[in-house]
Amino acid sequence: MLLRLLLPLLLLWSTSLSAQGFDSLMRTHGMVEVTQLAPHIRVELKYATRDNFIGENMYGALKKAYLHPNLARALARAQQALEAELPGYRFLIYDAARPQSVQRRMYQAVAGTPKKIYVAAPERGGRHNYGVAVDLTIIDDKGKPLDMGSPFDHFGEEAHLGNEEARVRAGIFSEAVPRNRALMRRLLGAEGLRPYDKEWWHYQERMPMSEVRKRYRLLAF
């Protein structure tokens, strides 16, 4: 009976934390809001919607993308280079810094399934949990995402980097996919970021995870 009475209060507390607290906690943990440095970058956080592999809104009302200042500045420079090369084109962020509590929920959702290889264990945290990884794509001057070969959060070989030309020959990819992925790698690579080979959308700083844990603060909330 007591638990039944407490459940609505716990739900209200959780909703309040995600709706109001995440923004404040991101800032107190040293993160910066990306569009303050790069106002032309678009943000559509997939984990603030049901359009993700879990099918739940895990961010509540959080709509802004936060990153460690180093990564945010690198992304801002990459956006400038993109616009100089292709006026009107922008990066579109799907996910950025991620609270450890959200990581736990994601990990629990894939536990015991083949998808678990794609989600970092929450105890020590992955790169998103330190604000040094970003999930993104490129949109054209009409706001349409470029063809990258698979949707965001696709758990399959189509999301993996490499063999793009072979997949074009096999009719799996359009001829635009290798060009679009190469554009991402070139622009972001020029700013010191590298991709994760199993997720075309995931870019991170070029340092081992052990060094990330030494230098940066875990988003332990």
Predicted features along the sequence, with ranges:
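Conserved metal-phosphate-binding beta-hairpin within the catalytic cores
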Residues: Y203
